[in-house]
Amino acid sequence: MSFSGKKFRSRRQQLVYEASLAGRYKKALSKHPFLFFGLPFCATIVLGSFWLSSFTAIKYEQGDRKVQEINEEDILKIRKNQREFDIKEEYYRLQGLSEEDWEPVRVARLKDESENVW
């Protein structure tokens, strides 16, 4: 035997509950569940989507501000400021050969610092 979820109320308490807003809503909800629960839920979802669309529009407007058309003068300035291209230089830069001009040097230890030899 299990306990039911229904709260025990005296006759007087039950009449007061049924006259309250919560009691009337529960009674109407049991008769027409879609009208009193499903429809407001769906309306909240749809209206929330419209309300939040303004926030997503801001995101796309900021992206549009970043992307602009470039006129011919700007293109000429960009091309003028470019560094010269040499295929051999790019090859060596990509190979990282210029970064191999270093020598590993051990850092001097502090006094009383162990060697950490395993």
Curated annotation (Swiss-Prot):
Membrane topology type: Single-pass membrane protein
Compartments in which it is found: Mitochondrion inner membrane
Alphabetized InterPro entries for the sequence: Cyt_c_Oxase_assmbl_COX16
Keywords: Membrane, Mitochondrion, Mitochondrion inner membrane, Transit peptide, Transmembrane, Transmembrane helix
Keyword Transit peptide recorded: yes
Described purpose of this protein according to its UniProt entry: Required for the assembly of the mitochondrial respiratory chain complex IV (CIV), also known as cytochrome c oxidase. May participate in merging the COX1 and COX2 assembly lines.
Family label: Belongs to the COX16 family.
Protein name in UniProt: Cytochrome c oxidase assembly protein COX16, mitochondrial
Organism of this sequence: Saccharomyces cerevisiae (strain ATCC 204508 / S288c)
Gene name linked to the record: COX16
